[in-house]
């Protein structure tokens, strides 16, 4: 049976081999001019978790588990700090029970058990959080993680309205495989796609692969059905509405504190068969940023409009030696994309970009929409492969003292230059102070008419055993800089426990009080994911 790794991104079969760990040590040793010895990864046999403090009632016993490996998988997400703690077998506060309800009635029963007993109930989708979004809280006599993997079906497809009724526990690949025979797709591909779920996307306001226009899951939701301790919350299925504050907008981004999302009607579309892409190089990152702004303000809406800094261009798209690379991509189920890519390239060239006509890739393969997708070409294809493989590569660096993480934000165009300078300086200063040096890179993951969503990556060589403290100091410096420069603490990674201090600065106090009032009605005993977004 294939099991999820309790420490690495992916399944146990995806954990790095001894040779891969050795090669990572050699590569980092050469990069930082030090000598590192590879550390063998932990195994499930080394787990020794605190014994469960609670026992499920007999009516729920057949959907509950308390085995160490299962509880370890449901303790941490997949951020740097999560990976290091799990690699070191550091599990001081695991959930006591993992419940896997098979229907809404069992979800209700689990929540009733938790509410009546005072146990924390933690919704769990795919476990890919990088912000401690489902990490068990302290101060509870028991913690029950509610894993929705059994609710993983596309229940209904409305091909006239191009929408589908989908259960919240469906993983990205399973969702697409169920839509594909009908010629449809949802076209929402976060980097966590392989190990994340629809309910998790909605609860965390996930950002997908569309770099412009429909960037977030918000744009694809027709209605949401959510089970709360107080009852069922279901919004009316509508293409749009002006009837007061939206129930959907309260559920979207609620991060599991108001209820468990069991179903949603989602907008879907025909599978694209026409594609066009281009990789345009620029003398400076600033020039590339200006081109991206002009492209999106022209309202061409490329599906891909990502700007990579030199380090990222070399690593992710095989374009070494170029200061900046703007990846452009268009797609459609019905319309050839030649004119759109040519228009975008003209804008990019006028802004100082360089690309030969031969490097503009156009694919007008109009085969059956139930078949697999046509391949991407050139720099865009190389970037896509690197994007999907990146989480796996981080597994190889665990246990070597290497400190690395990503941080994302969004800011208006007028504030972008100052935020860029401020955050880069804060990160580099912290790396110099904490690690004795390191590198900072940036890319745009999403671009709006009024501003970009920059994504910063930092890395440096830390001290083995002190990585978490070093990481925390760097993270705080950069987060403080983001807030001071007018950015958001997160564009698409969510708030979780990790971003809570800065989220408290960002949102109005009266909004927090209002959210508390909503929670007091839906979750009167305060058992759902306590500590996220607001204090209980």
Where are these regions (language model features)?
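N-terminal flexible segment immediately upstream of the FAD-binding catalytic core
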Residues: 1-112, 130-162, 310-317, 373-406, ...
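C-terminal substrate-recognition/cap domain of FAD-linked oxidoreductases
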Residues: 24, 37-41, 62-86, 270, ...
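C-terminal structured "cap/appendage" subdomains that terminate the fold
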Residues: 474-512
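Activity-critical C-terminal alpha-helical subdomain
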Residues: 496-536
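FAD-binding subdomain of flavoenzyme oxidoreductases
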Residues: 152-306, 527
């Amino acid at each position: 049976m294939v099991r999820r790794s309790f420490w690495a991104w992916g399944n146990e079969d995806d954990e790095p081999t001894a040779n891969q760990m050795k090669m990572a040590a050699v590569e980092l040793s050469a990069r930082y001019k030090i000598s590192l010895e590879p550390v063998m990864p932990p195994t499930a046999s080394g787990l020794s978790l605190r014994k469960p403090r609670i026992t499920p009632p007999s009516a729920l016993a057949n959907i509950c588990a308390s085995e160490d490996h299962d509880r370890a998988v449901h303790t941490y997400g997949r951020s740097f700090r999560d990976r290091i703690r799990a690699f070191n077998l550091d599990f001081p506060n695991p959930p006591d029970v993992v419940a896997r309800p098979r229907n809404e009635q069992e979800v209700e029963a689990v929540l009733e058990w938790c509410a009546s007993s005072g146990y924390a109930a933690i919704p769990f989708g795919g476990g890919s959080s990088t912000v401690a979004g489902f990490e068990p809280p302290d101060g509870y006599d028991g913690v029950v993680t509610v894993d929705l993997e059994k609710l993983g079906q596309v229940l209904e497809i409305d091909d006239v309205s191009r929408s589908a009724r989908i259960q919240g526990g469906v993983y990205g690949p399973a969702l697409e495989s169920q839509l594909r025979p009908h010629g449809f797709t949802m076209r929402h591909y976060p980097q966590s796609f392989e190990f994340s779920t629809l309910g998790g996307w909605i609860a965390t306001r996930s950002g997908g692969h569309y770099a412009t226009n429909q960037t977030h899951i918000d744009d694809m939701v027709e209605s949401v059905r959510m089970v709360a301790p107080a009852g069922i919350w279901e919004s009316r299925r509508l293409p749009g509405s002006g009837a007061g504050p939206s129930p959907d907008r309260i559920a979207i981004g609620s991060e599991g504190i108001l209820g468990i999302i069991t179903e949603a009607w989602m907008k879907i579309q025909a599978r694209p068969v026409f594609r066009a892409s281009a990789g345009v190089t620029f003398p400076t990152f600033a020039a590339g940023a200006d081109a991206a702004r002009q492209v999106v303000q022209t309202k061409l809406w490329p599906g891909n409009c990502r700007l990579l800094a030199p380090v990222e261009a070399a690593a992710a798209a095989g374009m070494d030696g170029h200061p900046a690379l703007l990846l452009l991509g268009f797609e459609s189920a019905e319309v050839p994309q030649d004119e759109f890519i040519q228009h975008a390239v003209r804008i990019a060239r006028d802004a100082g970009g360089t690309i030969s006509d031969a490097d503009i890739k156009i694919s007008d393969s109009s085969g059956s929409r139930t078949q697999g997708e046509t391949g991407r070409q050139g720099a865009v294809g190389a970037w896509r492969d690197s994007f999907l493989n990146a989480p796996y590569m981080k597994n190889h660096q665990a246990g070597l003292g290497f400190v690395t993480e990503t941080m994302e934000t969004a800011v208006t165009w007028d504030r972008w230059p100052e935020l860029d300078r401020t955050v880069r300086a804060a990160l580099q200063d912290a790396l110099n102070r904490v690690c004795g040096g390191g590198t900072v890179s940036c890319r745009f993951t999403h671009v709006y008419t009024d501003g970009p969503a920059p994504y910063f990556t930092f890395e440096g060589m830390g001290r083995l055993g002190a990585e978490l403290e070093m990481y925390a100091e760097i993270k705080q410096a950069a987060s403080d800089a983001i807030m001071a420069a007018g950015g958001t603490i997160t564009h698409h990674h969510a708030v979780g426990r990790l971003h809570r201090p800065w989220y408290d600065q960002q949102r109005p106090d009266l909004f927090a009080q209002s959210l508390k009032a909503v929670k007091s009605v839906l979750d009167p005993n305060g058992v759902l994911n306590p500590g996220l977004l607001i204090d209980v």
